[in-house]
Amino acid sequence: MYEQFEFSFFFFENSDNKVKYKAHLISSIKRWSIITCMRCFWTVQKSIFKARFFACRNFVKKHNYKLISTMTGSTEMVPPTMKHTVDNKRLSSPLTDSGNRRTKKPKLRKYKAKKVETTSPMGVLEFEVNDLLKSQNLSREQVLNDVTSILNDKSSTDGPIVLQYHREVKNVKVLEITSNGNGLALIDNPVETEKKQVVIIPFGLPGDVVNIKVFKTHPYYVESDLLDVVEKSPMRRDDLIRDKYFGKSSGSQLEFLTYDDQLELKRKTIMNAYKFFAPRLVAEKLLPPFDTTVASPLQFGYRTKITPHFDMPKRKQKELSVRPPLGFGQKGRPQWRKDTLDIGGHGSILDIDECVLATEVLNKGLTNERRKFEQEFKNYKKGATILLRENTTILDPSKPTLEQLTEEASRDENGDISYVEVEDKKNNVRLAKTCVTNPRQIVTEYVDGYTFNFSAGEFFQNNNSILPIVTKYVRDNLQAPAKGDDNKTKFLVDAYCGSGLFSICSSKGVDKVIGVEISADSVSFAEKNAKANGVENCRFIVGKAEKLFESIDTPSENTSVILDPPRKGCDELFLKQLAAYNPAKIIYISCNVHSQARDVEYFLKETENGSAHQIESIRGFDFFPQTHHVESVCIMKRI
């Protein structure tokens, strides 16, 4: 600093304004001197404060230690001012016995219920639990669990309260089956003996007597694992099971039922959906008889898309030397959760090497990808999902098959493309099936004589065997009751049209089709698919279905509307606009029968022209045999 001032002084001496700069220099030196002195002063004060603080703390620790040491014997050496604390076996020191800060009174943890969409599986379960309680003349208060006591059990994860709730229970009789394929039963509350508990039992059937292990408690029900079956339900047919992972995997919950029983169970699922979410329609008897569920031509080997996945350990853990589990969610066996965790994987994934619901070529692809993953899993920093999508090629009999297959298909250990040849007898063509793993690759499906191209990662129905049945059912129900040629359905609006499946397959029955889809890529594929199939009366629009009818100019009395929304169902604004448009017929296709029931009641009871329509039919279609899933088609017509 002083060298800087000397240089400045030399510079000032050789300038014309010597006096001015000398005065400025002196002022600067004074200012810097004052600042330096103040810094030194506060540094010294800080050191003194620290020394006094640590001396005081050490003094307190020292005397506190002497006091504690006398508590087990004589109190003669305790200072008089502190003697009363020893006599009363209490300490008035602001520090604890160990010299640490006084521990605060622990705060009680409160259970926070998560917000659940009412038509989601968790939301539907609430209705099913209430239905069970009603049938058993029980109130919700009589099955309410003390979740707070479990949350605040500080002894250990296996504390006395947890052990009382999470225990083995023998000879439990299953009373009902849920829409998710789980059994429902009642057991005694182990803590509040005057109460009962509703228990969910995976793979339990009405009439089963089983032994279970409760492992998780919710306010109004508990979850359990099925340990063994003591007495079998008349419905249970274990001889029908083909999946070696049954009872462990969440993929095929109903495999131990006859197919007729599966179809009837799914019909009841649709009935209960309208019972829970359309109670006014039930009370006013506005629902038609529920038709039998339409069977799938294939009950096994039908899925054209599967998505096995895996998890990797957190970064803090050491690198894996063994490949983590690659497969699907496990269900019903707690030891499997432990086994997978022991090798560093995620406790909810079951390692599988085949899927009985997937097509033959997808199982070949799964074998190929598992072998590839065995070599490359160390390159992954986190878990991922592997796409396996079937691709169809219409073969030219005059050319070798391998020359007609896409280069990006899954390959075996020899580097050859894995494929399966099948014959379409109805259309008199031969098809080659390959497995695609790139979500951006364009794949082809062949449905009801039409060819559809779309990105492998985009949505498309996964059971091609039942698709021609569904498209024909929709096509046959487009026409409103005949009231003369002027009232004939001439136009079709396909909301949520995707890549154009229902638009193109229904195009022959009407003069004009308008499809709308929020995805520009899907609309692009829909336009290309219409052109490739020689369909000229289809027009596709990019936009939200909620604003669809702003651009529709076809007369409503001659127009039918197809709805095929995602699982969450339709927006209320869209349903109001649909009612204002007042079409001649509405065909509502849904992969979530619960949101469908909710939407249908809202449309009929809450919208402007809803009362001008009535339900003509409700029918289920079994897109996913051996599972609890069912799709429903509700047809409404203008009166």
Swiss-Prot record:
Residues 101-113 have a biased composition (Basic residues). One of its GO terms (molecular function) is single-stranded DNA endodeoxyribonuclease activity. The keyword Repeat does not apply. PROSITE patterns: SAM_MT_RNA_M5U, SAM_MT_RNA_M5U_2, TRAM, TRMA_1, TRMA_2. One of its GO terms (biological process) is tRNA modification. The modification Phosphoserine is found at S92, S93. The active site is at C591 (nucleophile), E631 (proton acceptor). S-adenosyl-L-methionine binds at Q461, Y496, E517, D564. Keywords: Methyltransferase, Phosphoprotein, S-adenosyl-L-methionine, Transferase, tRNA processing. Its EC number is 2.1.1.35. It catalyses: uridine(54) in tRNA + S-adenosyl-L-methionine = 5-methyluridine(54) in tRNA + S-adenosyl-L-homocysteine + H(+). CDD domains: AdoMet_MTases (cd02440). Residues 163-228 form the TRAM domain. Residues 78-113 are annotated as: Disordered. Changing C591A: Unable to methylate tRNA. It comes from the Eukaryota. It holds the Pfam family tRNA_U5-meth_tr. Catalyzes the formation of 5-methyl-uridine at position 54 (m5U54) in all tRNA. May also have a role in tRNA stabilization or maturation. Belongs to the class I-like SAM-binding methyltransferase superfamily. RNA M5U methyltransferase family. This is tRNA (uracil(54)-C(5))-methyltransferase. It comes from Saccharomyces cerevisiae (strain ATCC 204508 / S288c) (Baker's yeast). The lineage of its organism: Eukaryota, Fungi, Dikarya, Ascomycota, Saccharomycotina.
